[in-house]
Amino acid sequence: MAALTRALPAPLHTSTTEYEEAPAPLPTTPGPQLPKYGQRKGWKPKTAADFNGGGAYPECHVAQYPLDMGKKNKGQGSTLALQVDQDGLVRYDAIAQHGRAPGSRVQSSFKDLVPLANRTDVTESERQMERPDDLSVAETAERTRLALERITHGKIKAAQPKHVPKTNSDATYIRYTPANQSADEGKQRIIKMTEVQEDPLEPPRFKHKKIPRGPAEPPPPVLQSPPRAATAQDQKDWMIPPCISNWKNNKGYTIPLDKRLAADGRGLQDVHINDNFAKFSESLYIADRHIREEVRARAQLQQLLAQKQKTSKEEELRLLAQRAREDRSGLSSSVSGSVAAASASRLPAETGINLGGYGSESGSEEESDEEEEDEEAIRERNIVREEKRREREKEMRMSNMGSEMRAKMLAKEANRDISEKIALGLAKPSASKETLLDSRLFNREALSTGFASEDSYNLYDKPLFAGSSAAAAIYRPAGSSRNDESFGGGTEEGIKEEMSKDRFQLGNATRGFEGAEGVEAREGPVQFEKDTIVALDGSADPFGVEQFMDAARRGGKRTAEDRDEERRKRARDE
């Protein structure tokens, strides 16, 4: 190896191993700060950088399009970009040129109305409107012809039916040589083959039957627990109540209340009562108790103040009465002063101390009598005040009542029945025992319990209301005098008289009942006669038993009277 190295010439260029340096990292712009999982409440990803190359965030309930997947591309809008001309003015004619074919010219300015000969911005070559050459005319004509043919062929193809099968109507000639070489040599024949014409309206010759579906694959085996019977609790949990409407009941069935409530679904959820209701009720109770205690204390204080005021007023009245008595008795002013001082010190009168040595027992008795009279007068005044207060309260209630209620109260007070009359200022007469007994009933025989003997049958022997006056009073319609006058006094004669005065004869019947023309006028009630049936032996037969038995004995023999009766019944039925 060393000899080989010496034999080789020296290298012209020395090779040095160069190590490529690692490229410096390019400065990257920091991306958006994405919130961590669990802290994305209220955050909405809007740009593609928010997804960080991944998918959507399921915890953010907004429309998300990662990598623009599912995002609908917006079509070309109709909004025009603002354009200006070489002078910096806005080109409003861009609106008129929008949507036109390229190359079309729209006259949208005033200079388009000026003739070309008078315009300064048009060159001489543009003014000279040269005719097109023959080549351009031919090209335009060919382009127009092709466009018209395209439109025409499109309409023709639309009218022609599609998918029409092509029929090969050409005949086919076949040279046929029989294979059997019999005694008589077979001759070659030429056969002409053509397609048979088919009737397009011929029904199908063969019926296509659908192959029945094969058996399904057996289900895969699934390991499951053996079936077990449902318990009563399971049946109750799985029970679905029938649907019962709260508005319709066309059949009119009577549905129990528990079934109606079961269909409402109220028992499916447990009712949880908030504890704040109890706290609220307790606070209300405590507040009510405090308020009642305050009201009670305030009432006691007011009562105590009223009692003190009443005591002071009574003391003042007592002093005034005592001073008046002293003035009437003619005592001196010094004595009155001492009496006032003694009364101010509230010394009782029972101590026996006389007023200045001038008092006596007779004077104390007079004072006690006057005090009793004053108390009686005060009591009477209090009673009068209470009555007046009640009257004022009643008047106040009457004023607050409605008109209807006030009228009822007034009518009730006006129609009150006062059964006792009191003569004021007179002594009450004492009721004597003689007025309590009726002397007309003395020495009279009492009636029996049944008012008659048990074997007598004379209860209806006499009319109930004997006399025309009683009957007229009973059968007269009740009413005011005005009604009596309008209906002829309520009597039959008055009614007939009023009907006879009828101008249009509306109240008179043109035809009455048969057999009632000769009946005389009747006063009072209708009087009936007792129908007594007499038997053959002359005894009374009230129920017709003897007559019935007699007809039964005769049997089927009918008399002429029976035939007449039957004939009358038939005529009446017909």
UniProtKB/Swiss-Prot annotation:
The keyword Nucleus applies. Its main location: nucleus. Associated with the spliceosome. The keyword Nucleus applies. Residues 363-377 have a biased composition (Acidic residues). Residues 378-397, 493-503, 558-574 have a biased composition (Basic and acidic residues). This is Pre-mRNA-processing protein 45. Involved in pre-mRNA splicing. One of its GO terms (biological process) is mRNA splicing, via spliceosome. Residues 24-33, 215-224 have a biased composition (Pro residues). It comes from Cryptococcus neoformans var. neoformans serotype D (strain JEC21 / ATCC MYA-565). Belongs to the SNW family. Residues 1-46, 203-234, 350-406, 478-503, 549-574 are annotated as: Disordered.
